[in-house]
Amino acid sequence: MFYAHFVLSKRGPLAKIWLAAHWDKKLTKAHVFECNLESSVESIISPKVKMALRTSGHLLLGVVRIYHRKAKYLLADCNEAFIKIKMAFRPGVVDLPEDNREAAYNAITLPEEFHDFDQPLPDLDDIDVAQQFTLNQSRVEEITMREEVGNISLMTDNDFGDFGMDDREMMREENAFGDIIHESSAANLLLEAEPGPAHLPDKTPNLDYDDFGDNNLENSDGGILMDKILSNEDGGGIFDDPPAITDSVMMPQDHGDDDDDFDNFSPAGGPDSPDSGPVEPLPNTTDQTDQTEQTTLVPNEDEAFALEPIDITVKETKAKRKRKLIVDSLKELDSKTIRAQLSDYSDIVTTLDLAPPTKKLMMWKETGGVEKLFSLPAQPLWNGRLLKMFTRCLTPLVPDELRKRRKGGEADSLEDFLKELENPEVPREEVLGHRSDVIDQTIMEEPSMLQASSMEGSRTALDESMMPPPSRQRGLKRKSLETLEKDAVLPPMGVLEQTLQPLDQSVLSHQLEMPQVELPPEDTTNLSRLIPELDLLDEKSKDKDKDDSDEEGEEGQGGDQDQEERRWNKRTQQMLHGLQRVVAKTGAQSISLLELCRNNNKKQAAAKFYSFLVLKKQQAIDLTQTEPYSDIIAAPGPRFHIV
């Protein structure tokens, strides 16, 4: 946007308009009142730079919002003024007449009331002043601190602790010390001669130098105590380190009756005895004093300051965690990735799954699978216990041989065993070896078992050689079921003889070129009888392949023809022809499915049972069952001979 700075600048003419259009809550009442809509509209109509239509529309929206806010604020002010006017001119307030519009002076002026202060005072005797004062009077012991004066020598004071908090500190401000402090020195006082006996003071306790009075300080040269404390000469100030006491310094005798010299600070004052003579002058102790001033009371300075260390509690500060800046390594997608994403449409494409057109086909689709046919009964069982009883016998049992093979490691997995049991390949020789079925027993002029075995062996070889490989697994299962039905029910010999005549010569020549099956020598006479059977089987195999291809083509067309319309297939026709021959030859009115499926495997029995159901649906036979899981009896139906 080349006009972004013009529109979005904070001091631009359209800044508040743009803000009102996109962030209305950001505008305050002052911003709304300060905004000039006339200049803003003119700026929008004739902008300095060209703006897009969308931008001008946004700005017009901001103008409308600001105008709405202004109208709302004006309405609020009008309502407030109206309410105030209405409250001021209430119906209960009566207007004053024209001659009484000015209020009276007394009504608006406060009265001046001067109180009489010349009242007689009460008598002094009426108030017990002494009693009032004694209430707040305390004893001296309660309000006065005790003066604890001990024999503390200032010579040993190390200047630590409190000092100068008594009356001696107050004497610094007295004028009596003005001349004495500067004139006197410690050397002059110490070397001054002791006065004679005539000038000795009396034995009465005097307070001349007790630092509690200044009566005699004006005429004296100053006390030794005050000169020693307050003098800065000779290093004897109160703020200097006191000199150490050595043996060379002469100290006066301690008199027990001298109560005034409680500090025992200096050798000032002569002895009280009258016979005391003049004292010899003291030797020059300047060198000794300088030496003592440089010494300390503790011989080892390191030991004097060898204090125990104090535990330093360091306040733990929380370390500031450094923020880690996360930067995406891949900032943009390359063209290959974008092109691959655009070409990937797997998430929006699914397989087409159309529902069956009729409800019956929908029901067959739900329950017609192998997992439903082999686990559910023919009629719905709502009781769970009965359903468990039905499915209890449907679990495949693994034979001992397969178990031994499984333990020996010859098989891959148990699933392979179960698949072999559920979908075994149909052994044609085994089927023909057990020809003791009811249908086979009713066929007239049936050859011997040896001839049947030779015929079946040749037919198996031809079927395996001429059968094209199935394209799908579904076609393979259908073909295997049809071959089972074909092997289980053989057409009568009369039908074989009738179909022998119109055989094509090309088919016969093609079959003669096929490899011959080894037969026993005693069955060579029946070889001519095997050829028509082989030809018939060849035709049947071709027809079967053609039917299968037609069925697959119809399935590939999307199920245009309903499965119900294709009623007859080869298996049901063979089953119906077999039942018709049995009824015609034996005269039996019922056929047992259990006897028909004897010595058959699961797949063969299922194929026969399915054929029975198809025939029952077309009313060719009637099925009866006395109780669940019992034998099914088939009897000729109303359309048994019509179909």
Swiss-Prot record:
Disruption phenotype: Morpholino knockdown of the protein causes abnormal embryonic development. At 5 dpf, morphants exhibit delayed food transit along the gut and depletion of enteric neurons. It holds the Pfam family Rad21_Rec8. Residues 266-278, 285-296 have a biased composition (Low complexity). Signal peptide: none annotated. InterPro entries: NXP1_M-like (IPR049589), Rad21/Rec8-like (IPR039781), Rad21/Rec8_C_eu (IPR006909), Rad21_Rec8_N (IPR006910), ScpA-like_C (IPR023093), WH_DNA-bd_sf (IPR036390). Cleaved at the onset of anaphase; this cleavage is required for sister chromatid separation and cytokinesis. Cleaved by caspases at the beginning of apoptosis. May be phosphorylated; may become hyperphosphorylated in M phase of cell cycle. The large dissociation of cohesin from chromosome arms during prophase may be partly due to its phosphorylation by PLK1. GO terms for cellular component: chromosome, centromeric region; cohesin complex; cytosol; nuclear matrix; spindle pole. Keywords: Activator, Apoptosis, Cell cycle, Cell division, Centromere, Chromosome, Chromosome partition, Cytoplasm, Cytoskeleton, Developmental protein, DNA damage, DNA repair, Mitosis, Nucleus, Phosphoprotein, Repressor, Transcription, Transcription regulation. This is Double-strand-break repair protein rad21 homolog A. It comes from Danio rerio. The lineage of its organism: Eukaryota, Metazoa, Chordata, Craniata, Vertebrata. The gene is rad21a.
